[in-house]
Swiss-Prot record:
Organism per entry: Drosophila melanogaster (Fruit fly)
Name assigned to this protein: Transient receptor potential cation channel protein painless
Entry GO CC: calcium channel complex; membrane; plasma membrane; transmembrane transporter complex
General function of this protein: Receptor-activated non-selective cation channel involved in detection of pain sensation due to high temperature. Involved in heat nociception by being activated by noxious temperature of 38 degrees Celsius.
Gene name per UniProt: pain
Membrane topology: Multi-pass membrane protein
A UniProt-annotated Pfam family: Ion_trans
Alphabetized Gene3D superfamilies for the sequence: 1.10.287.70, Ankyrin repeat-containing domain
Cited PROSITE patterns: ANK_REP_REGION (PS50297)
One GO term of the biological process aspect: male courtship behavior
Extracellular membrane side: 512-523, 577-586, 650-708
Assigned protein family: Belongs to the transient receptor (TC 1.A.4) family.
InterPro entries xref list: Ankyrin_rpt, Ankyrin_rpt-contain_sf, Ion_trans_dom, TRP_cation_channel
Region (Disordered): 656-675
Amino acid sequence: MDFNNCGFIDPQAQLAGALAKQDIRQFVAALDSGALADLQDDRHTSIYEKALSTPGCRDFIEACIDHGSQVNYINKKLDKAAISYAADSRDPGNLAALLKYRPGNKVQVDRKYGQLTPLNSLAKNLTDENAPDVYSCMQLLLDYGASPNIVDQGEFTPLHHVLRKSKVKAGKKELIQLFLDHPELDIDSYRNGEVRRLLQAQFPELKLPEERHTGPEIDIQTLQRTLRDGDETLFEQQFAEYLQNLKGGADNQLNAHQEEYFGLLQESIKRGRQRAFDVILSTGMDINSRPGRANEANLVETAVIYGNWQALERLLKEPNLRLTPDSKLLNAVIGRLDEPPYDGSSHQRCFELLINSDRVDINEADSGRLVPLFFAVKYRNTSAMQKLLKNGAYIGSKSAFGTLPIKDMPPEVLEEHFDSCITTNGERPGDQNFEIIIDYKNLMRQERDSGLNQLQDEMAPIAFIAESKEMRHLLQHPLISSFLFLKWHRLSVIFYLNFLIYSLFTASIITYTLLKFHESDQRALTAFFGLLSWLGISYLILRECIQWIMSPVRYFWSITNIMEVALITLSIFTCMESSFDKETQRVLAVFTILLVSMEFCLLVGSLPVLSISTHMLMLREVSNSFLKSFTLYSIFVLTFSLCFYILFGKSVEEDQSKSATPCPPLGKKEGKDEEQGFNTFTKPIEAVIKTIVMLTGEFDAGSIQFTSIYTYLIFLLFVIFMTIVLFNLLNGLAVSDTQVIKAQAELNGAICRTNVLSRYEQVLTGHGRAGFLLGNHLFRSICQRLMNIYPNYLSLRQISVLPNDGNKVLIPMSDPFEMRTLKKASFQQLPLSAAVPQKKLLDPPLRLLPCCCSLLTGKCSQMSGRVVKRALEVIDQKNAAEQRRKQEQINDSRLKLIEYKLEQLIQLVQDRK
């Protein structure tokens, strides 16, 4: 129902409408009807506020006050008073209505909103157009008692704001005279007397008040104000005077001023006062002191946040600077790299200073274990990613949630950086000493304060690349391929030793099982293979116990580990003299042989032979694809099984009762009944098995008794839909999978090797839960020797390959970049004498054992020919790109020269005319 049409008008709506129409009579009538001018709407705005801030509403303001609105009304949401709303209107009438004398009501004319008093607000918004109205408003406020000396957040008084309005010409002198006529005006105490200097410069004819002398003593507040004013010359003078006054004090008083210096330093950094910063820093104050508030940034963090690269550069050169691990300087600056440089500040320059500084850890992590590379990827800053990677950012740092920084990184950025890690020694490609240098600085974390025996999971980033469909092609990059070669070179001892022992165990337990169940007369041979089987079982138990101790939580999450536990259990039952009957023992032996063979196939598939790993991968992928597809289509198998059971599952006795033929002999009858029971679907389980057999095309249709047209129809549907369509579909999926695997055989081989190495490394590291095993120095040293490449094997985190000398791999023996002396952070130079070897050939992981790589891949110290060929291709591509870039630069310079000559020619023609 519309109450407005019935004469019931909402007083509040009438009040708003009257103000919009500037109808004072309806406005007063609405107030008389009970409307509230102070009532706020959904936007937290009242009619009273609108009247105060709208020019020409003097009568409306008086009406509101007469009906109960307060002259000191405050909007609680905005903390804004009525006087500030009236000043925003810049209407003298509105302001006069509010300041009208009312007994008992004193307006607070100096109340601030947004750090501005009404006088400051009027002066700050002064223009040529509103100068007369602003003059009248200021006169009203000053006559009412407003102070002309209250400053805003920049320590500007109202008169100072007026003097700074250089574009305002009309009425400016009258406004200044209005302030000068005020008896309490102070033009000397704020901003070091800048108001007096401006008055003398702009209006020298005006008579100024006498200069106020505040005394010779200068305090911290004075220095703070001078810093904010930007007069660094004056600050240097005042600070020198301030220090002179402090020299007469006690030592404890001098120490007490260190915190005050810290505040001055922070202020100089925030405002970019470099001269003041150097002056304060020259006092020798402790730059590592923390402020009083715990969450407040220190000096270096302040310089990074405000982009003051000059102060940051000065602080990083301080020998006494100590950076705490929780500084997170790079993380703080990366989020601000998109901000444009302003007034000398540049977050980009700060970022470059930090990544090039020896004092800043490029892999520093915050509380969530997020490293700077995480933030560069998060903010999609490609330039920051490239610079971090170039300076050795580790790509395998895991966050608190187990994610890696390269998770959302564009693959092309990572590939481009990997290309830059493949360089040469500068010799000609045909020379004998031509070297391909491969740098692994992003694959091996450089720990500053970690112990030498700390184990690292170096396979984590490569395992992630292998799992990512967008990045797994990078496994064929020479950087990753060569790294996998080195890791396999270290871990191959464990793999081949495990493979050898398990092969002996497989042969022993299968031979022992055959001899045992065939009751061979070779008792000694049976006992010998039984002993070998027990030794193999003992080895498996020891191996699985070590894995469980190292990683008890994750152990049972692996299907392979569960299968190995089942294998150990069944092997024990097979080898021991149990009280089981013969049939149970045979079943246990059968399952034991199956599990032993499956485990052996998995080990064979992990061999570094491309043909073997490809075929094992095809077997695994086709099996997984078949299981997934058949699980979905199994509903049709069950459906047809039930149909056949219902149609053909008549009992043999029922068929015989209907048959007039005599019964066969008893033995033949039982065999025939069993055969007919399977072929005639007499039991549900047998019906399911028979249906699965028929799915392969083995129908045995002659033994099926078709009794009606419907039985023929159901059987025909099964043949068409299941045998022809579904079975060929499954075959097609298998063929498709094998074709894909063959097309990516080399990539799949790299994935298999990555998975094997990652699994072995995870077992050895134990994910940090290895307990007393890794606490043992000897065990930890052995694991580190077999597993970790850096720092005990590659101190320089790079290798050299000789493509013209049999692809030999050389290991640098010295570190010119990372092994620095403590004095002046200088470099430790490589020895130049030819008698001192700088590099060595790749050697076996354990000197007592031969290199296991040579069993299948040739000599130990030789890199794969495919890897070397790809590395040379990368170098050729980089050289070609560099040549194209240089040619483009030459073309650009030629075009600029042509343009310059044409401009000269045109100018010459114009001059002749």
